[in-house]
């Protein structure tokens, strides 16, 4: 049957990258087109190429010709209807023109929108003149049903004139009552213009079963429920990829034949894209290769003042030779230039990831990991066999990274540099809110359901939870809601900007990939994400933000001021016993990487005592080692409870530093090379295939090669199979040793500062917010438990940021909180206070308000935060004086402060003060809220953290505290880890899945949570395994009628 049906190529197809229009993924459309025997498929998302790389990768696997195109609605003016146009790239030149047209339209409009007119094709101006008539693109007029015949004829004549010999008029038949009228109008226009007619499906779904989702997307797009959409919904499900039999029964044979004629003319493939990195940073008289060599050896003199060892020198030469062979010199030099700029501006930066395997990167100052200090594996970074570009990630201070980004824009221009996109996809709460509104569900129920689904366990689990949220799980709307939510989960919602992945080109970047405006002013993004760039082997440089680098620079500066001399990062003693004692005790709140619950649980068991131990510590608390079953064997061997054994000498070479247990990706690769006969490039291909294993499978060939190679070298079958299972456990979650080594440097530096300069460290943490795992309230409480004196924000002493303040007779300074913690206070108001205070002290609130020119809002915020206490007294008095002192904003007359007598107002209670602290500053320096509630909690037998820490293993216990952190790691099989805080410290709790389902609302909604359970204390790791949860948030109302505004950090 298939052989006698007319051939067909779908030339107008929109995926879900036509956001809230297409109801199928690009891959689904490609796969379905192949199943239906289409000759080709054109992906034509609206003014976008965001989905084409995904379609390209799938089409390559399906061996289906993919046509690259895009659809547009050209705004023809108030008196004319819009013109719907589809453009298809014939060749590389046509593709570049198409990408530039998309860039032009997107650049004129706000993020997520575009604006193009017929004039942009008929007579484009200036630098876009070459786009006139869209050379090397085929054009199809795609009129909507209902367009008047004469209007359509006019549009057809215009298109025929603009694209002679390259234009068609599309006929779309959707089994609609207007099909005959539409066909007549199209035939009339074709006759009037001389354009041939081509069949178009205008598909937006791969199967008709997506029609309910298609309707839901229309409702979301228009902000109404499905029931209110009426004619905005498609009349039927015909906008799917239809069978050739169905198409043959609807369309004239000639219209179907034209689809094949057009497909034959479109020969362009994304594989043709060639990317050239900029080379202007190479000075005259040098080639990129000679300049890279010169700078590498100049850097080596600084890195190795006593000279490189023969092994390092050989490694440098090996790397330079491979970089030259693959022609990556300009890429390395570009990153080198960016890092050099940052350092010239005093911005801390450090390379990480696989780049830390490179001796060249170390010599250039891009990375900080000495290749002579670890087991680096350059093939993890660059491999000739892999034939994929290297990826250099560089972290910069998060508060100054924008300076680096603007340097790149200024150096290369916005036509040659743009950020990589990130596809923002539907997640549980956004899915449930949008689909719930589309179905007309009550807003109260939607909010309750969304709050109860911080993660997604599938529609069955959703239905089980609906009853507690006020909806019958057996109702039709509940079943529809669950079905739609599961289908929409993971759909792209819009494009955002990557944290810092830059694409920089030698020529015009918009001819390689379309560029559009970002939401943030001064930023532009390409329409592809990092996976798209990787799939096409396009280079990018990651200019990433890392809060801890900001902390380190600030803390070193503050510590240097206290010591009377500058303190640099490299001056931190490398093997400080006190620092490692603190780390082994899991006293790591606020430090880098080892502050999470999982890391803190591991520290007392692994007990790091040197730098490489920290490298292992950073890497071992990852899904890869955990899923691969490597954690417990390593710990048993480290603690002397299990013998260290190796299956053979070749394996010993790779695993000696980790006690015979593979922890790092490089070790997996090294075993494949040393013990199974892989080349280094094949070994990295094995690692990368494991990253895709969970998504696509396809590692059987590596299984055979690895197991066969090991058996051929006399390793046992049991070992070979066990090793492969461990490798599978890594998946995409294993840490490269080079990455862990980079992070371990920062983990140690931050730990040393916390141990020896706790005041500077706390101030730096507060001044670098938002960042890290803990909120300022927890950071301050932890510092105070360690003896750090913290003083409140005060207009007489505080600057915008936290600072160190000496006190007479005190051995160490106190930390004075900054005005940046005051909610509702702008920085310019705080700076004005500082400047006015320098001239002379303030006499009173009115004097401060007048001299600093403060608006009423700023005065109210300062009063609420108790920052006027030394000028005005307690909060109530301060609020009265703030109102009396507010300057008139009338610019026509001089501001006058009216003298009024302050009434005798009672001071707020201690509970009211604490509650007001949390509302206005986010923390309190008074007694902890639970200290005030301790009598009530003691009456219910809730114990403090200090008491619980004395309990033996397996004792029944009760704990209560303010929820500060909720976590649900991927490897925990649905378990949630909760951190509570009381007046004596943190309490770690474990909540199992069966309890979560019974008490989801208490777990997710409570601010003050009581937990009944069993205390566990093993090897210095202590936590409470929950058996029952109680929401005690109502007790906080005893402090203040507004409760306590204590925020937790959830599911980071």
Curated annotation (Swiss-Prot):
Protein's cellular compartments: Cytoplasm
Catalytic activity: DNA(n) + a 2'-deoxyribonucleoside 5'-triphosphate = DNA(n+1) + diphosphate
EC number: 2.7.7.7
GO biological process: DNA repair; DNA replication
InterPro entries recorded: DNA_pol3_alpha_NTPase_dom (IPR011708), DNA_pol3_finger (IPR040982), DnaE2 (IPR023073), DnaE2/DnaE/PolC (IPR004805), DNAPol_HHH (IPR029460), NA-bd_OB_tRNA (IPR004365), PHP_dom (IPR004013), Pol/His_phosphatase_N (IPR003141)
GO cellular component: cytoplasm
Keywords for this protein: Cytoplasm, DNA damage, DNA repair, DNA replication, DNA-directed DNA polymerase, Nucleotidyltransferase, Transferase
Gene Ontology molecular-function annotations: 3'-5' exonuclease activity; DNA-directed DNA polymerase activity; nucleic acid binding
Pfam families, A to Z: DNA_pol3_alpha (PF07733), DNA_pol3_finger (PF17657), HHH_6 (PF14579), PHP (PF02811), tRNA_anti-codon (PF01336)
Top class in the EC scheme: transferase
Entry similarity comment: Belongs to the DNA polymerase type-C family. DnaE2 subfamily.
HAMAP family: DNApol_error_prone
Functional summary from the UniProt entry: DNA polymerase involved in damage-induced mutagenesis and translesion synthesis (TLS). It is not the major replicative DNA polymerase.
Official protein name in the record: Error-prone DNA polymerase
Native species: Bordetella bronchiseptica (strain ATCC BAA-588 / NCTC 13252 / RB50) (Alcaligenes bronchisepticus)
